[in-house]
Amino acid sequence: MKILLASLCLISLLVILPSVFSASSSSEDFDFFYFVQQWPGSYCDTQKKCCYPNSGKPAADFGIHGLWPNYKDGTYPSNCDASKPFDSSTISDLLTSMKKSWPTLACPSGSGEAFWEHEWEKHGTCSESVIDQHEYFQTALNLKQKTNLLGALTKAGINPDGKSYSLESIRDSIKESIGFTPWVECNRDGSGNSQLYQVYLCVDRSGSGLIECPVFPHGKCGAEIEFPSF
């Protein structure tokens, strides 16, 4: 009898544990978003090169990379709901804006849907408790309109002309314009020079407002970095 009771307890525990672990990594469990924009010139002048989308060369402006749920300890959830795949029909009204503000630069050339699918399934599915698929992409587009990074930089005399600028001046000009401290990510061009690649801004859980970042990503840039043309 004791053996039977012990077996039943073990079976019950095995049934309960998966739901506990699932809940801990559910789409409800995140603290804030990183809103990440990338400079196309710095994507394309690396040794990997780039391919323009089917719609043609994007504008010389920062493009959306993604809207990423994140934890305050620096980790993040990913691929939270395989039952909610990307469905382009849900964002049919956004496609014109998506192609302009969220262009793909990956090779081979494409429409952008593979890029958006990746972003939704890896990151967007982890925010479903707050925003659905259409709202996820609409939120990113709204944030892009609110945060004119290129305008903030050019206003401060920081232009995409291949010259080097201080990392401090880049950060300060964005903060002065937008009101919040950015995180700047660098990569290296084909000659190994450090350059402005991506800018991270932090957004509250609702996706509606910018906030000061609870934590910044790892990595660092040099004191002087290039801002390449595109």
Curated annotation (Swiss-Prot):
InterPro entries: Ribonuclease_T2_eukaryotic, RNase_T2-like, RNase_T2-like_sf, RNase_T2_His_AS_1, RNase_T2_His_AS_2. The active site is at H65 (proton donor), E119, H123 (proton acceptor). Disulfide bonds join C44-C50, C80-C126, C186-C221, C202-C213. The keyword rRNA processing does not apply. One of its GO terms (molecular function) is RNA nuclease activity. The keyword Transmembrane does not apply. Induction: By phosphate starvation. One of its GO terms (cellular component) is extracellular region. Gene3D superfamilies: Ribonuclease T2-like (3.90.730.10). Its EC number is 4.6.1.19. It catalyses: a ribonucleotidyl-ribonucleotide-RNA + H2O = a 3'-end 3'-phospho-ribonucleotide-RNA + a 5'-end dephospho-ribonucleoside-RNA + H(+). Residues 1-22 form the signal peptide. RNA binds at Q38, H65, F115, H118, E119, K122, H123. Keywords: Disulfide bond, Endonuclease, Hydrolase, Lyase, Nuclease, Signal, Stress response. Belongs to the RNase T2 family. This is Ribonuclease 1. It comes from Arabidopsis thaliana.
